[in-house]
């Protein structure tokens, strides 16, 4: 059974620092005619980034399963990372202070595995809110940029041909990337909402006796979380930091409401 102290010793947020700290995926539009060396270098960078992401996901999954006392699901996550790789990754974190109290919700006397369910809920809610907010930020930023180049063209009294050649066409790849990335964050937010709703269904069924929550249900929800972390776009650290305090307060309030509904009084 995970103790209250154990469940509190994690950085406050949806995903571990190793995952959040990775650079954002780059969406490029390579043009024909560029040398093969550049394409090879880009592919190598993508492979390295993918390997680093997978390693971080596996380490976080190992941490979660140890913290939550859940069995490792090799069918979903493959083999667990070896201790040497975990130690090597941990050495890249210079300041560990900001990464304490990850599951910052107050669990009180909620028994295991009900407390695990509440922590999984905080992860789902946190990620759902951040992905939706960042997708909206990208959409607004892209719209503002598109509007700014139109205004610039009007102020400069550009002809349509000049506007297309000098501003619109060069900006199109970046604008399309922004739209695509915003949509992917909104889709990720929707998927996190589905997991969140699933968690609520399990909690509602066992809210009178949280200790009777089936462990296999927690494992199933953990699998869903792992797959979303693996396939979803990352939220930048700076954006996460701007929202951290507010989201922590919101998820604490939500957890307190759920816990109060399970109290016999």
Residue positions per predicted region:
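Cytosolic/matrix-facing juxtamembrane and C-terminal tails of multi-pass cellular membrane proteins
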Residues: 182-260, 265
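Membrane-proximal soluble regions of multi-pass membrane proteins
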Residues: 76-81, 115-122, 215-230
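Alpha-helical transmembrane segments and their immediate juxtamembrane boundary regions
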Residues: 2-50, 132-187
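Membrane-proximal, non-transmembrane alpha-helical segments
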Residues: 97-134
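Long, hydrophobic, amphipathic alpha-helical segments used as structural scaffolds
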Residues: 128, 132-135, 139, 203, ...
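Membrane-interface amphipathic/juxtamembrane segments adjacent to transmembrane helices
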Residues: 36-86
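Charged, amphipathic alpha-helical oligomerization/scaffolding segments
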Residues: 58, 62-65, 116-119, 123-126, ...
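Short, non-transmembrane cytosolic segments of multipass membrane proteins
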Residues: 73-111
């Amino acid at each position: 059974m995970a103790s209250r102290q154990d469940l509190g010793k994690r950085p406050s947020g949806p995903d571990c620092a190793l995952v959040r700290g990775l650079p954002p995926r780059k969406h490029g539009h390579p043009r024909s005619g560029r040398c093969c060396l550049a394409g090879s270098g880009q592919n190598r960078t993508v492979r390295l980034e993918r390997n680093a992401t997978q390693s971080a996901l596996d380490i976080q999954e190992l941490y979660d399963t140890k913290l939550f006392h859940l069995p490792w699901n090799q069918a979903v996550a493959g083999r667990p990372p070896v201790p040497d790789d975990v130690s090597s990754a941990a050495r890249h974190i210079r300041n560990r202070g900001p990464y304490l109290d990850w599951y910052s919700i107050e669990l009180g006397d909620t028994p295991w595995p009900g407390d695990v369910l509440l922590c999984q809920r905080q992860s789902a809610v946190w990620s759902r809110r951040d992905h939706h907010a960042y997708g909206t930020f990208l959409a607004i930023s892209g719209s503002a940029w598109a509007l700014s180049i139109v205004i610039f063209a009007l102020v400069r009294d550009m002809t349509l041909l000049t506007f297309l050649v000098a501003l619109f066409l060069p900006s199109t790849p970046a604008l399309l990337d922004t739209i695509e990335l915003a949509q992917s964050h909104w889709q990720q937010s929707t998927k996190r909402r589905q997991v969140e709703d699933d968690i609520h269904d399990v909690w509602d069924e066992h809210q009178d006796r949280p200790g009777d929550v089936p462990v296999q249900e927690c494992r199933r929800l953990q699998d869903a979380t792992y797959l979303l972390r693996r396939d979803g776009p990352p939220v930048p650290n700076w954006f996460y930091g701007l929202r951290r305090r507010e989201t922590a307060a919101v998820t604490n309030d939500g957890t307190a409401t759920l816990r109060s509904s399970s109290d016999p009084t």
